[in-house]
């Protein structure tokens, strides 16, 4: 978001807490103030060379002045809140057509199905008019900080991402497959990607007891992008085992007592589909569409196992007789995901990872 300092001598960035929402902010070199992308508060930094010495006083110091316009963001202690990020990378060779639609559909689902307040949902897309809600690396980082800021028992948090994902060689030995999974912000070519280790440290490990986090990640190589300790390996018959993905180093990748569950678009070595076949009507990511469809069709109290099975079956049957007996919705889905072709299905399998193992056919799914 900020240009690098002109000096060739590297100086570590200074971190300050926002005077409004207390989110950690990275202060550009030489700056004396910074505006928070989340609550819009302006935090001023005194120049130590010119600031007068503090006067002794027995009176308590006044609270910092907050310059945030009211009603911009929810208070971070809401019972439910979500960060939804959809990136189309438009006008670039990486362009995706369906990701902003994914974000809008997920927002609609959270509000209408799971009773999230519209004010508790932070949207990051290229269509946002506020430049601080464009899905740059810095804005995404601050949004993730906001998501878990001050969370308490009873809170339900959601992180949805639709965009490019990648992976890179891991050298510290904490990955079973030898690769770190990554998310690609809008400016990833200049600012770099967000690595799974950082995502885990930001929104997983701080979760206290009683807080529930769900991530829905529609991206390539996203199977273990939250770096959670356990992966549910399920076959076509619906039988499953939990694979232990805890690092051999012993580094803890779980929570501080809370619950973290991730549903992702594909395995770490697979890619996720995005299509513009019906762009005059709609375009979306395969995983997000199947996730929402499975939720809408499910009965009250559906389990994680039945949800995952439904998503996998829909994707697997895409292109094979229009998805079976699903009717108009499935036929449209088939055209959408195969570009109008009736030949072959998609080669991606949604994955489930968690901080703890559980019976996926007994635990009800809810956000």
Swiss-Prot record:
The answer to whether keyword Hydrolase applies is yes
Q: Identify the domain of life.
A: Eukaryota
Indicate the enzyme's highest-level EC class: hydrolase
Q: How is it modified after translation?
A: Proteolytically processed; by an autocatalytic mechanism.
A GO term for molecular function: cysteine-type endopeptidase activity
What are the catalytic residues? 164, 220
- Function as written in the Swiss-Prot or TrEMBL entry: Cysteine protease that cleaves specifically after arginine or lysine residues. Does not cleave caspase-specific substrates. Acts as a positive regulator of cell death. Required for both oxidative stress cell death response and hypersensitive cell death response mediated by immune response.
Q: How does it assemble?
A: Interacts (via N-terminus) with LSD1.
Put simply, this protein is called Metacaspase-1
State the species of origin. Answer: Arabidopsis thaliana
